[in-house]
């Protein structure tokens, strides 16, 4: 089935992540620590930790850094005791935004998130005010030109729920979040390497932005992304590639 154009947005996201590699590593270390603290330090019995470690390797994080983060999480090394807090809100035009944070000071974090929303024309909502507009899924994006039929066969055999061909020729594979690591391994064994692979909150519908509104919306998203305590920002805003 056809879908919205994704490729330019994904390339922009990857470039931004590469430009902020130090911040990406900091976020991943937090995620590894929390995953290890909650589910133990064995990646074979802790799917969340396996996902976090895989993401760390994809970001070229050294193995020593990963192991230290795991040890902090399970209590072998002193480290900050982070808690996970989700904030929900709206951007201009009523676009839905979810902000996932890990923090050792929730008073600081909520103040910073609220300030970013208000500074750039948005406002914070209550718990559950927008999360119902998203689905929690595993998502893989493959470059235009990827053999569609072979990818579809491999994906469905691996346990994927859906395969979507976008208008720009890129292909999305969607799977249950708990099956993400299994599907990722099966696709790579079949010879398919995704340009983007993540467990995410996927919007059920999108709100299109262009021109000045797109610029304003991007400023809000960037302000939230740049906060130290923010791990992920999800939105149903589809910003045109200018």
From Swiss-Prot:
One record GO biological process: regulation of DNA-templated transcription
Broad class of the protein's primary localization: cytoplasm
GO CC annotations on file: cytosol
GO molecular function: DNA binding
Keywords: Cytoplasm, DNA-binding, Transcription, Transcription regulation
Highest taxon in the source lineage: Bacteria
Pfam family, one: TACO1_YebC_N
Localisation: Cytoplasm
InterPro entries named among the record's database cross-references: Integrase-like_N (IPR017856), TACO1_YebC-like_2nd/3rd_dom (IPR048300), TACO1_YebC_N (IPR049083), Transcrip_reg_TACO1-like (IPR002876), Transcrip_reg_TACO1-like_dom3 (IPR026564), YebC-like (IPR029072)
HAMAP family, sorted: Transcrip_reg_TACO1
Family: Belongs to the TACO1 family.
Entry protein name: Probable transcriptional regulatory protein Bphy_2064
